[in-house]
């Protein structure tokens, strides 16, 4: 009887489960949308119980669609939206508050204070720049603002987890409270040099260490999924680190970009921890005793900008239509779009930037707006690649591997090659986040024997070669940089006018 690996891909907007065979073919996909709540400007929340219930439902549905028995699944690997913060009562198992999503900006005041007083400490210990993006300030906000939670936490009655931790805890019926090194490194509480929770930071933020999960490797058996046949849960990684693994980014210098709700560029930096002023240093994964680090640029709004064109502007009826609309014009017509809906991430790190469309004339059409939106994605990726080249050397970034749903857009991928001036490689299976989770799970239970075996099963779908002349490339990019300059600090400036 054939055996399979199941990936849980718990994203920002959907709960997904995928079944892979030993040749890394996707046998089935089950997916359902998750509800997001926006109770106040800057707030983004989800219901943790909805996340769990829908994820279990998708596991069962993926197995059913694959026309296999649950007993044929050798292991489960989890990849999750990172930083999103869940806290729950350890006795009842009930969340004490909604999940505070990584996009949430309510804690800007806390992180401004941390930046002003402890920037170098946080950067040197965690590799991260204080920002509402990460879990630490979200935890502090819940402890300080939800009645009774701090008192319960002090008594050891509260547990914290990123989404992977919560899912594993629920799947194991409360038996296992763990996370992996990649997810721990995104909390802004984890010392990436000492590989432990940092007590100095916990003291600054007044966070009890007892609420934190045990940190384990990214590929080992953590426990068994009781609601779905007691399958071993043996892979765990943050979604972007999982995607780097799924792109075979095993060697120093390997770079990938995942185009999803946001876009995330990771470069495997091996065992070296780079001190970058504008990028994040994070843990890619730990397998056995081997810890790999990565440089990361985090772009908050890319695929979400395409959704805005569909839902907010009504220019297209489906996200797929944006490519044909953007292709109806030969260029952007001088229009630039900066999608700073919730601030700007790497390399600007400005929570007060706000969105902008500039360069509009009477000749501007729907096509120009659509094209400017797509081009904004590529420009933001170049912003990050420029900093990587500056930090580690130009010789490291000659090829960019791409994945995620938005990478199916051929117009965008060609423009990405053009604006970077390097080759873009899209794999046959763009579900690399799920594939990476499957690989980590499969390696732990000897479903696959080695990284070399995995390399032999990976294939390319298409390569995009740059065709834009360098002077044109640089003129376009200069226009983008000027547009970004005009968005910086906008929300703060407006506040001072009131």
Curated annotation (Swiss-Prot):
GO biological process: glycerol catabolic process; glycerol metabolic process; glycerol-3-phosphate metabolic process
Presence of the UniProt keyword Nucleotide-binding in the record: yes
Enzyme class, spelled out: transferase
Annotated catalysed reactions: glycerol + ATP = sn-glycerol 3-phosphate + ADP + H(+)
GO MF entries: ATP binding; glycerol kinase activity
Binding site for ATP: 12-14, 261, 303, 307, 405
Superkingdom of the organism of origin: Archaea
Signal sequence interval, chain numbering: none
Record's keyword terms, sorted: ATP-binding, Glycerol metabolism, Kinase, Nucleotide-binding, Transferase
Binding residue positions for glycerol: 82-83, 133, 239-240
Functional pathway: Polyol metabolism; glycerol degradation via glycerol kinase pathway; sn-glycerol 3-phosphate from glycerol: step 1/1
Enzyme Commission code(s) on record: 2.7.1.30
Binding residue positions for sn-glycerol 3-phosphate: 12, 82-83, 133, 239
Gene3D superfamilies, A to Z: 3.30.420.40
Role: Key enzyme in the regulation of glycerol uptake and metabolism. Catalyzes the phosphorylation of glycerol to yield sn-glycerol 3-phosphate.
Family: Belongs to the FGGY kinase family.
Identification of the protein by name: Glycerol kinase 1
Source lineage: Archaea, Thermoproteota, Thermoprotei, Sulfolobales, Sulfolobaceae
């Amino acid at each position: 009887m054939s055996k399979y690996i199941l990936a849980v891909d718990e994203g920002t907007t959907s709960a997904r489960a995928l079944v892979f065979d030993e040749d890394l073919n996707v046998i089935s996909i089950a997916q359902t949308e998750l509800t997001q709540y926006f109770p106040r400007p800057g707030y983004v929340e989800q219901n943790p119980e909805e996340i769990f219930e829908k994820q279990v439902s998708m596991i069962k549905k993926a197995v059913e669609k694959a026309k296999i028995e649950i007993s044929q699944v050798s292991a489960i690997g989890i990849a999750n939206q990172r930083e999103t913060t869940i806290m729950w009562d350890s006795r009842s198992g009930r969340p004490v508050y909604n999940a505070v999503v990584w996009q949430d900006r309510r804690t800007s005041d806390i992180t401004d204070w941390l930046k002003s007083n402890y920037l170098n400490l946080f950067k040197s210990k965690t590799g991260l720049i204080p920002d509402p993006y990460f879990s630490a300030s979200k935890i502090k906000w819940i402890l300080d603002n939800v009645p009774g939670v701090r008192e319960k936490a002090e008594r050891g009655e509260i547990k914290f987890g990123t989404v992977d931790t919560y899912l594993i805890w629920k799947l194991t019926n409360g038996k296992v409270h763990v996370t992996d090194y990649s997810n721990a490194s995104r909390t802004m509480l984890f010392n990436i040099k000492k590989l432990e929770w940092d007590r100095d930071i916990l003291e600054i933020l007044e966070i009890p260490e007892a609420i934190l999960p045990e940190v384990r490797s990214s590929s080992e058996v953590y426990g068994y999924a009781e609601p779905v046949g007691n399958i071993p849960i043996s892979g765990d990684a943050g979604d972007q680190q999982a995607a780097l693994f799924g792109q075979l980014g095993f060697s120093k210098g390997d770079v990938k970009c995942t185009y999803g709700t946001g876009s995330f560029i990771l470069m495997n930096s091996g065992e070296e921890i780079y001190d970058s002023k504008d990028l994040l240093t994070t843990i890619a994964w730990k397998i056995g005793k081997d810890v790999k680090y990565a440089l990361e640029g985090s772009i908050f709004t890319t695929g979400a900008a395409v959704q805005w064109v569909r839902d907010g502007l009504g220019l297209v009826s489906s996200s797929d239509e944006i490519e044909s609309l953007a292709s109806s014009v030969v260029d952007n017509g001088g229009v630039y779009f900066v999608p700073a809906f919730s601030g700007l991430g790497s390399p600007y790190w400005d929570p007060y930037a706000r969105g902008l469309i500039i360069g509009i004339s009477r000749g501007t059409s729907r096509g120009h707006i659509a094209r400017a939106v797509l081009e904004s994605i590529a420009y933001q990726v170049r912003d990050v690649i420029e900093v990587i080249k500056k930090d580690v050397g130009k010789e490291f970034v000659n090829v960019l591997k791409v994945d995620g749903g938005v990478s199916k857009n051929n117009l965008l991928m060609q423009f990405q090659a053009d604006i970077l001036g390097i080759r873009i490689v899209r794999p046959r299976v763009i579900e690399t986040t799920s594939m990476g989770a499957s690989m980590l799970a499969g390696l732990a239970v000897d479903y696959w024997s080695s990284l070399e075996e995995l390399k032999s099963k990976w294939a390319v779908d298409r390569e995009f070669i740059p065709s834009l002349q360098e002077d044109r490339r640089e003129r376009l990019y200069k226009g983008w940089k000027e547009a970004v300059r005009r968005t910086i600090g906008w929300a703060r400036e407006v506040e001072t006018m009131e």
